[in-house]
């Protein structure tokens, strides 16, 4: 589910407290009151449906189809990657992370950032979006394995990264 600018919103069936314009704020407040941190898991990029609908990029004169780069996760093709050479792609991330900050998000895991290709420009874009959000957030990158050749860049731009592939049972 997204808003009119293509920003991700919680599913109100799974998270009833997110109804209306609440977003994750009521849930984050509840979790914070228990002394815990609140985090979300995002797939890299912009939802394909947002691009198909060609929604406006918040705070810009761009449209969604101008900022996608047609890369997608091999295992989940719901999002397109972002063309970080277009400043409107950064504006999209900035808007998404300002929304997350307004809800009180403390931790963000961004999936599909390293395999099969390390997405250096997008990693830098996520870091910058957090810096501009007005709220400190832990940035965790996934999936692994992130090549150790990229270790210095990852360490300079994220707090954590996964170094192995998903573990699946095979009973």
Question: What function would you assign to each model-found segment?
Answer:
Residues 66-71, 83-91, 95, 135-171:
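Glycan-recognition surfaces
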Residues 96-145:
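Extracytoplasmic, non-cytosolic globular domains
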Residues 1-29, 33-112, 116:
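Aromatic-lined carbohydrate-binding/catalytic grooves of carbohydrate-active enzymes
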Residues 53-57, 122-126, 154:
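Short low-complexity, flexible loop/linker segments enriched in glycine and/or proline
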